[in-house]
Amino acid sequence: MKEKIPFYNEKEFHDMVKKTKKGTFSGWYIIDKDNKSVEFSGSFNRQFKLNKPVIPVNTEYVTRKEFNEYKVSNDQRLTKIETTLAAQGEQINKLTQTVEKQGEQINQLVQVVLLHGEQINKLTQTVEKQGEQIKELQVEQKAQGEQIKAQGKQIKAQGKTLKSILQALGGINKRLDKIDPPK
């Protein structure tokens, strides 16, 4: 049967230090009367050298069964963490691939936008040329309009002249009719 014996006073502590030959220890120790072994738990500054090797720990005493249970649960927890990390790694890889694909798509869209920009520039130049041509045509039309007005004035003047000539001819015809009546 194991019994837990704490250090209650300084004398016990110094006696323990003398038994171990070196090191300092604070905490408690377990004596197993069945197999005559001693186990320690507490705060160690140096490892104690006893007849049987002792692994210093900074926690309270636990049985081998409790330790194994803890180890199994810890292994399970670590396995879960590993699987979670692996799954997250796969997700990160998928997201990285998605981001790369989107980057490629963005590059393609940028190229399309640049091509559209070039086309827009060409169309703008074409529209500007057409605008200049329209202005030139307007100037020509204006000049033609002025020419037509001038020709129209000339035609009016010629029409007036022809009218006056016709009137004069009409007057001459009347006179001729009066002079030589038709037989």
Swiss-Prot record:
Disulfide bonds: none annotated. InterPro entries: DUF16 (IPR002862). Gene3D superfamilies: 6.10.250.40. Pfam families: DUF16. Belongs to the UPF0134 family. This is UPF0134 protein MPN_100.
